[in-house]
């Protein structure tokens, strides 16, 4: 395996310097970058061969980290969203109304953004080190199956560094729910 393996501290440095990182999540490997760095984001889309219109997920270590990006409070669904992020080993991503702070490249041109508060200890530590959420999209070429091993991740993206760590053993990527309609999207 030729991909460099990074500590959490080195991974945070890479992201702050505008890099794209592969990292373990709850169920699959993800690709991430600073959501406010357009150049890094465009590099991520090129690597993944993903169209801009699809949008991506922001993954954070805490509700406080996503608050600048979403209209979360005082909504009919607020309590359900907040409670879902407290359930262990059941990662849930919510599509929520975006604030004006969210760049169009993150939303895919919509007025919503997908967000998740992670329970993965290494991703939490990374977001805490950065003090902001990161982009999270599965580490695979668009349309292919997500990768579930470090080796497969390195084979798919040989030029990327991978943050050390393990998947949490959850069998499927996070559920995605639309908060305003309460419909499950995935």
Swiss-Prot record:
It catalyses: L-threonine + hydrogencarbonate + ATP = L-threonylcarbamoyladenylate + diphosphate + H2O. It comes from the Bacteria. One of its GO terms (cellular component) is cytoplasm. GO terms for molecular function: ATP binding; double-stranded RNA binding; L-threonylcarbamoyladenylate synthase; tRNA binding. Keywords: ATP-binding, Cytoplasm, Nucleotide-binding, Nucleotidyltransferase, Transferase, tRNA processing. It is an enzyme of class 2 (transferase). Residues 5-186 form the YrdC-like domain. The keyword ATP-binding applies. One of its GO terms (biological process) is regulation of translational fidelity. Its EC number is 2.7.7.87. InterPro entries: DHBP_synth_RibB-like_a/b_dom, Sua5-like_dom, TC-AMP_synthase, TC-AMP_synthase_SUA5. It is found in: Cytoplasm. Belongs to the SUA5 family. TsaC subfamily. Required for the formation of a threonylcarbamoyl group on adenosine at position 37 (t(6)A37) in tRNAs that read codons beginning with adenine. Catalyzes the conversion of L-threonine, HCO(3)(-)/CO(2) and ATP to give threonylcarbamoyl-AMP (TC-AMP) as the acyladenylate intermediate, with the release of diphosphate. This is Threonylcarbamoyl-AMP synthase. The gene is tsaC.
